[in-house]
Amino acid sequence: MSIFRIYVDGQLFYHPQLSQLAITEAKMTEDAENIDSLTLSAPFNHPYLDSIHPMASTIVCKKGDNTVFEGRALNDGSDFYNTHTWTCESALAYLKDSQQPPFSYKGTLKGLLEYFLSVHNKAVEEKKRFKLGNITVTDNNDYINYSNSEYSCTLDAIKSKLINTHGGYLMVRYTDSGKVLDYLAEFNVHSIQTVEYGKNLMDVKITRDHTERITALIPLGAKKKTTDEEENEVQSDERIDITSVNGGQNYIYDDAAVKEIGW
């Protein structure tokens, strides 16, 4: 039988057979397109409440011999009953802790990810480093040409130059020799379990975020170019807009959306 345990900085924090190390919640949330999370709660009399230091402590969840989660606490809090709760993010978030300098790259897709990880690993401590694992995402020509004139965190750089253009998913594997980062076109683990409402599906919740809805927008193009007194072409701060082709208005709007929620 595989026993689920939780460790904080190598110290046992939860074991189902030790009543003094009881917890009230350990809920993992997997996100294929983002960073996995863990919600951990423990009662006021847990002996190691003070051992979890947000952004510093390493929280590891094991099932049998396998590590199923590793990460850090982002925040902590307590409720009316003094139950303490921590929200944790997985080790993939370590890629937010390093900066990629401006770069220009020509070569293979694998080579760019190797470059990103090399820069990251040189900038962070041992526990935040990754080895490059399996790459099943491909480019038709096996040749890419990317550059960036700005600094960006490593995770954003990977998403911008690889995931957003070539697709795929990042997956962290926890091995005896360290963390391995895979870049996969599709996940290589398939569940044979069926989903049955009332049996293993107890609740369904749908949330729609309307804060990003736009009823009207102002399209702007490139900056206009003008000629100065010396007949040199210079770039002005004025942008090309749609006024000349939109009845004198520089905006467009969704009539149905405006009627529903206003401007």
Residue ranges, per PLM feature:
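Juxtamembrane "anchor/assembly" segments of surface/extracellular structural proteins
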Residues: 1-51, 89-93, 256-263
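Short polybasic amphipathic segments
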Residues: 2-11, 59, 181-183, 217
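N-terminal export/assembly leaders
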Residues: 27, 37, 117-148
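Short beta-strand-centered interaction patches in the first periplasmic/extracellular domains
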Residues: 68, 72-95, 133-214, 218
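Acidic, small/polar-enriched beta strand-loop surface segments
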Residues: 189-263
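Surface-exposed loop/edge segments in extracytoplasmic proteins
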Residues: 12-17, 66-68, 227-229
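Extracytoplasmic/secreted envelope proteins and their assembly/folding machinery
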Residues: 110-114, 155, 159, 216-217, ...
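Surface-exposed cap/loop segments at beta↔alpha junctions
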Residues: 47-133
